[in-house]
Structure formats: structure tokens, C-alpha cells
Amino acid sequence: GGWQAQLAALCHAFRELAHLHPGAFLIFVTNEKWADNELSIHEAFFGVLRIAGFDDRKTVNASRQLLAYVESFAWGELTDWHRPYSAQERQELDQVLADGRYPVTKSLADVMTSTNADTEFRFGLNILLAGLETELGRT
């Protein structure tokens, strides 16, 4: 595939790595020191973006956005933010929404509480990749 497919594959692989080694991943995202494995991840993203035709600044910016997306999404999964609500959590949400101050949120409660992490991850990644395609067209 093209550069978009290569970046998508890297993002999916990074997310999968987080699930295979959650303890190490959580340490990785909170540690400020550079490690060889971290540099390898950056190198892979930089390489694809550079070959795609992004200039230096956009290569770095795009890589940071993609990595931040994967890190934040995987963090949410590993800390139980990206999962369907339990019956108790749904009941608590319904109670908070009962006073009518948040009608749009209330109308979306069924969707909000029955998330599918894989679908949401692909959705966000597709948006980022579409934005990068647009940005590359401006270069």
C-alpha cells in the first residue's frame, strides 16, 4: 500500500504492542528519557513521512500527532476509559442526565456507553490520515 497504509500499519502495531506489554507501555509513555526502542518508532514514522513527500517540519509534526493519538488511545484502553459502560456506570450517567441540562448528551448516551475501541481507533486514525493527505497536497 501507499504511505497512508504504511502509517496505519505502524499505528496499529504500536497500539498492539501496548496491549502485549501494558506495564512497559505505561512506563514508556510517562518516562521522559529517550530509549532506543522509542527512537526506532520515531525513525519508522519519519521514514514513511519523508518518503511520502512531507518536508522536515511537517514530518516531525505529523509523526508527533500520530504517536500522540496512539499513545493516548492505548492509555485510555489500558486504564479502562475505552470500553463499554457497566450497568452501574450507565445508571450513574442516566441519573446525572435526568435533569435535562444536557439534551444532546442524553440523546447520545446509548452510543457513548456501548463503545467499540477498534472502531473508534480506526475512525480517529482515518481522520488523521485524511488530514495528512490534505496537508501533503498543500506542500
Predicted regions and their residues:
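Short amphipathic alpha-helical interaction/hinge segments
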Residues: 22, 26, 74-81, 136
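A general structural signal for well-ordered secondary-structure junctions
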Residues: 24, 55, 72, 102-103
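A contiguous pocket-lining binding segment that forms or flanks enzyme active sites
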Residues: 42-79, 87-91
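C-terminal peripheral helix-coil segments that are non-catalytic and often amphipathic
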Residues: 51-54, 79-139
